[in-house]
């Protein structure tokens, strides 16, 4: 079992129960899933770019990504409905905890000029979204084999009802919020 999950059960639950006055353990917010998304707009011209992006995402997440397709045709972007334009992965359970641990302790500190992540990127329901400009911050990605530096979106979905509860949950995991 992931160390972060054990830490959640032993320390975070007690800390949040005390802070928000929950009467049941089931009221305590928890991380439900982490979604990684990578949009590859250039995949219209070159299918190899999407394959490389999917391979990078599979390496980062540990599971095969789903290829996302365009929902509508947009003439300005020269895309048609059904064109493959990106990939996404939804992590739950053990892989989710492993990814969260690697994100907090290894990947984010490797970002150039890192001063913390924006504490205001919550959606109003306790879910946190952030973007990473380079996939090479993850140690699994070999810099020499990368054809192009791509970014990805990371969404952490929690069971928290408010942004305050979600922020407290992530802060309890020592998530590096900007001061």
Swiss-Prot record:
The record's listing under InterPro entries reads:
Ribosomal_uL5 (IPR002132), Ribosomal_uL5_bac-type (IPR020930), Ribosomal_uL5_C (IPR031309), Ribosomal_uL5_CS (IPR020929), Ribosomal_uL5_dom_sf (IPR022803), Ribosomal_uL5_N (IPR031310)
Q: Name one GO cellular component term.
A: ribosome
An annotated GO BP: translation
Tell me, what's a Pfam family for it? Ribosomal_L5_C
Write down the PROSITE patterns for this protein, in alphabetical order: RIBOSOMAL_L5
Keywords of the record, alphabetical order, are: Ribonucleoprotein, Ribosomal protein, RNA-binding, rRNA-binding, tRNA-binding
Gene Ontology MF annotations? rRNA binding; structural constituent of ribosome; tRNA binding
Its function?
This is one of the proteins that bind and probably mediate the attachment of the 5S RNA into the large ribosomal subunit, where it forms part of the central protuberance. In the 70S ribosome it contacts protein S13 of the 30S subunit (bridge B1b), connecting the 2 subunits; this bridge is implicated in subunit movement. Contacts the P site tRNA; the 5S rRNA and some of its associated proteins might help stabilize positioning of ribosome-bound tRNAs.
- What family is this? Belongs to the universal ribosomal protein uL5 family.
Q: How does it assemble?
A: Part of the 50S ribosomal subunit; part of the 5S rRNA/L5/L18/L25 subcomplex. Contacts the 5S rRNA and the P site tRNA. Forms a bridge to the 30S subunit in the 70S ribosome.
**Protein name (database record):** Large ribosomal subunit protein uL5
Organism, scientific name: Vibrio vulnificus (strain YJ016)
């Amino acid at each position: 079992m992931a160390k972060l999950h054990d830490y959640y059960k032993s320390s975070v639950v007690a800390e949040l129960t005390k802070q928000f006055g929950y009467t049941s353990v089931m009221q305590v917010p928890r991380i439900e899933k982490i979604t990684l998304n990578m949009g590859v707009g250039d995949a219209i011209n070159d299918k190899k770019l999407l394959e490389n992006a999917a391979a990078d995402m599979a390496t980062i997440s540990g599971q095969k990504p789903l290829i996302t397709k365009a929902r509508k045709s947009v003439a300005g972007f020269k895309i048609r409905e059904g064109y493959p334009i990106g990939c996404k992965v939804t992590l739950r359970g053990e892989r989710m905890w492993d990814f969260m641990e690697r994100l907090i302790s290894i990947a984010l500190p490797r970002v150039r000029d890192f001063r913390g992540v924006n504490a205001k990127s919550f959606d109003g329901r306790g879910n946190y979204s952030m973007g990473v400009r380079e996939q090479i911050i993850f140690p699994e990605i070999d810099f020499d084999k990368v054809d192009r530096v791509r970014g990805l979106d990371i969404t952490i979905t929690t069971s928290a009802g408010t942004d305050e509860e979600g922020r407290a949950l992530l802060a309890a995991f020592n998530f590096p919020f900007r001061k």
